[in-house]
């Protein structure tokens, strides 16, 4: 099929996976727009770019299925060109080129200039950070570094994203100022490891210095921290969080496990005792802080005793938010040399058991919020409700606050004080205070 003239080309960028991919797609779309390209919503484009995830089996399957779907559409003349980028392409490019050759070209995670060239656009270094945001207008992700230097045995991210590379404080402040001018009120700081930020550039952990600079930006009212690592956490961050009202009393710190034998095999560089002390220090330094974590069950060699230790820890710590995943045996990782000896059905059962525990904890914690009033940001209107969040909740993964739109009006993108009148495990219901 003949490709349409450049003026008529419409480029559809499909994003799969995590918030880092969302950010990368926004950068790509910003560059395309700056080159005069027509970036459109899904199903409207005749040129498709798929930004893939290659982290675990389920994510890889979703990415492969999406590539197959659009390769088939190209075969049937429904789209003209298909390009693939992101982590799956970085990790498995030779295999993908062999198995799905109908894709026009595959690109890795560091090949933005080449991808833009293939799309007929110019790469403009001075525009880095100027994105076409896809999130609601009131919040945006700010990726402060790329890659990871940690040796975690189960994780394939360093294979796909490389070593840690921090962005300068000056660049990040400039990017955040641009977002604020466009109406962004909440910055969600993301990285593979926030706590490592600055070690490559400044030879020290500089997350605290970055936060001190970001809180000065006019228009930014919330700054949220995602993906901290429990080893080497810069404790000055807690002092800043307590002092600065713009820093949300919230942290996402994936712990993965707590049994010492599993932590050692995972090469996490910590112990149950050290982790427990760290979390207690968090709560002592910032009373009321919401702690989100992620756990992995079914790691090679995980015994019933290890799992019981993990359950006890969950019950003891009463995390505010949690996700739990069944271990995925990833090639070219350290753990791939181990025997994947926990049956899939046991992995799934353990994951469900952990989440059942967390559901009860979440229910209890949310019941305590009844009658309280919280400052909420209103993200959107959906169905019969306005949907917002407290400072203790991140988009997509945490609690939402639902306000009955048939009884009350609140403005999306704005902060509103909401009194909680009803609560379930994962949602709060409220009315303007």
Curated annotation (Swiss-Prot):
Radical SAM core domain residues: 134-364
Subcellular location: Cytoplasm
Binding site residues for [4Fe-4S] cluster 1: 18, 53, 87
Family in the record: Belongs to the methylthiotransferase family. RimO subfamily.
EC supergroup of this enzyme: transferase
Protein name: Ribosomal protein uS12 methylthiotransferase RimO
Annotated ranges, domain MTTase N-terminal: 9-124
Note describing how the cofactor binds: Binds 2 [4Fe-4S] clusters. One cluster is coordinated with 3 cysteines and an exchangeable S-adenosyl-L-methionine.
UniProt keyword Transferase present: yes
An annotated Gene Ontology molecular function: protein methylthiotransferase activity
GO BP: any one term: tRNA modification
Classification via NCBIfam families: 30S ribosomal protein S12 methylthiotransferase RimO, MiaB/RimO family radical SAM methylthiotransferase
Subcellular location, principal: cytoplasm
Gene name as annotated: rimO
Domain of life: Bacteria
A single Gene Ontology CC term: cytosol
Residue ranges of every copy of the TRAM domain listed in the record: 367-433
EC number: 2.8.4.4
Key words of the record: 4Fe-4S, Cytoplasm, Iron, Iron-sulfur, Metal-binding, S-adenosyl-L-methionine, Transferase
Gene3D superfamilies: Methylthiotransferase, N-terminal domain, Nucleic acid-binding proteins, tm_1862 like domain
Pfam families, sorted: Radical_SAM, TRAM_2, UPF0004
Substrates-to-products reaction catalysed: L-aspartate(89)-[ribosomal protein uS12]-hydrogen + (sulfur carrier)-SH + AH2 + 2 S-adenosyl-L-methionine = 3-methylsulfanyl-L-aspartate(89)-[ribosomal protein uS12]-hydrogen + (sulfur carrier)-H + 5'-deoxyadenosine + L-methionine + A + S-adenosyl-L-homocysteine + 2 H(+)
InterPro entries: Elp3/MiaA/NifB-like_rSAM (IPR006638), Methylthiotransferase (IPR005839), Methylthiotransferase_CS (IPR020612), Methylthiotransferase_N (IPR013848), Methylthiotransferase_N_sf (IPR038135), NA-bd_OB-fold (IPR012340), Ribosomal_uS12_MeSTrfase_RimO (IPR005840), rSAM (IPR007197)
The keyword 4Fe-4S is assigned to this record: yes
Binding site for [4Fe-4S] cluster 2: 148, 152, 155
């Amino acid at each position: 099929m003949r490709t349409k003239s450049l003026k008529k080309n419409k480029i559809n960028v499909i994003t799969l996976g995590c918030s880092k991919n969302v950010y990368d797609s926004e950068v790509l779309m910003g560059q395309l727009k700056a080159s005069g390209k027509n970036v459109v919503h899904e199903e409207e484009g005749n040129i498709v770019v798929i930004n893939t995830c290659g982290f675990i089996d389920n994510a890889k399957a979703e990415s492969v299925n999406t590539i197959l779907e659009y390769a088939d559409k190209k075969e049937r003349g429904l789209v003209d060109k298909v390009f693939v980028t992101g982590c799956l392409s970085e990790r498995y490019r030779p295999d993908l080129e062999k198995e799905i050759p109908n894709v026009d070209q595959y690109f890795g995670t560091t090949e933005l200039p080449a991808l833009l060239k293939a799309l007929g656009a110019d790469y403009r270094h001075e525009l880095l950070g100027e994105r076409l945001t896809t999130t609601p207008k009131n919040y945006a992700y700010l990726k402060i570094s790329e890659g990871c230097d940690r040796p975690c045995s189960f994780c394939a991210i360093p294979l796909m994203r490389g070593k840690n590379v921090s962005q300068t404080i000056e660049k990040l402040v400039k990017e955040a100022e641009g977002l604020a001018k466009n109406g962004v009120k909440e910055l969600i700081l993301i990285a593979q490891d926030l706590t490592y930020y600055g070690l490559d550039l400044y030879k020290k952990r500089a997350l605290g210095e970055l936060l001190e600079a970001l809180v000065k930006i006019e228009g930014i009212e919330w700054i949220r921290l995602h993906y901290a690592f429990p080893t080497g956490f810069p404790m000055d961050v807690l002092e800043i969080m307590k002092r600065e009202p713009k820093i949300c009393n919230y942290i996402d710190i994936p712990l993965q496990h707590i049994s010492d034998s599993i932590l050692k095999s995972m090469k996490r560089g910590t112990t149950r005792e050290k982790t427990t002390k760290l979390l207690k220090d968090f709560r002592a330094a910032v009373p009321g802080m919401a702690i989100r974590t992620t756990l992995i069950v079914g790691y090679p060699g995980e015994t019933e005793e290890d799992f019981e230790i993990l359950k006890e820890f969950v019950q003891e710590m009463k995390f505010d938010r949690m996700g739990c995943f069944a271990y995925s045996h990833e090639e070219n990782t350290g753990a791939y040399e181990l025997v994947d000896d926990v049956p899939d059905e046991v992995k799934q059962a353990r994951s469900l058991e952990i989440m059942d525990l967390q559901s009860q904890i979440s229910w209890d914690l949310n019941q305590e919020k009844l009658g309280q009033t919280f400052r909420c940001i209103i993200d959107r209107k959906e169905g019969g409700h306005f949907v917002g969040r407290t400072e203790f909740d991140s988009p997509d993964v945490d609690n939402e606050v639902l306000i009955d739109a048939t009884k009350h009006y609140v403005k999306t993108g704005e902060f509103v004080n909401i009194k909680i009148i009803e609560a379930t495990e994962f949602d709060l219901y409220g009315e303007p205070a």
